[in-house]
Amino acid sequence: MRRIKNALSLAVITLALISCGGNKETEEHRESNDSIVPVVKDTTKITVNEETKFKFDFALANIPSPVGSINELSRWGIAYDNSLLNDTKKYKNYDTEFSKAINLGIYNIDMSYGMVNNKGEDVLRYMKTVMIESDALGLKGAVNQMVGKRAEQNLDNKDSLLKILDEIFVKSDSYLRTNARVYTASNVFTGSWVESLYLTCKMAGTVTDGSVKAKAYKHLWDQRFYLKNLTELLNEYKDKKECVELNDELKKIHSEIEPIKDPKDMDDAKFKLISDKIFALRTKLVK
């Protein structure tokens, strides 16, 4: 599939869900999957200029898909563990635009983790939660429901799922040029990046195989490049307190990785120190 070169491209899942939405929906509440979900309308003024859009495009183009990392993790021979995933019932706790967007990204990765491990029931459960969260952000749900139904019918066929995602990717192109939703997309992407690294570090911390550890350490070391791009993107939202606080934590993680000049210098102690910071941040985001 030409458009998906890194397995389940994060842009497909994230941006397709968002791009299908419009600004016409003003209902105070919407019903989704038999649950009444408050629609969050963020009224804080955000100025989004061409530079911000460029940084978003640049970050998306220069940060490997977090889902690609999950796909790589599935090839390391580490047993699937859905106890690490964010509880789908917790979506009701997320009552701000920021928390919903961040956790939409987190749920995207959890869904993808189940998908690359061929765990159909988990895929369906997380896909439904992704739909609820995207709907609660005021995004149009009709396409999501159509995709979800088709995905449910093809849970055992990874290629078919990828084709579905590839199809809706086409519809997300225009979204990248839509000023009003760049902030939301930035938060969704950040949530996905954090969750991907969280799962990688959690699972790598359980292995004793030296070759697998080396891969995990190299992966974490590589993040110093990508994390810099991500923090520069989030720097654009200085008028958003929650985003500033998140970015401060990301910068602390970057400051621990950046001085390490070679992946071979990443030992158990350093890996644990950085992993613990990632775990602490992730705990704040999903509470």
Show which residues each predicted segment covers.
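Non-transmembrane, amphipathic alpha-helical segments
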Residues: 92, 96-99, 111-118, 122, ...
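N-terminal Sec/ER secretory leader and immediately downstream segment
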Residues: 30-147
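Extended amphipathic alpha-helical interaction segments
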Residues: 155-237
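Secondary-structure edge/capping motif, primarily at the C-terminal ends of alpha-helices
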Residues: 111-118, 137, 141, 176-179, ...
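C-terminal motif of bacterial Sec signal peptides marking the signal peptidase cleavage site
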Residues: 16-19
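A cross-kingdom marker for long, charged
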Residues: 231-287
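Bacterial N-terminal signal peptides that target proteins for export
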Residues: 1-8
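Bacterial signal peptide processing site
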Residues: 21-24
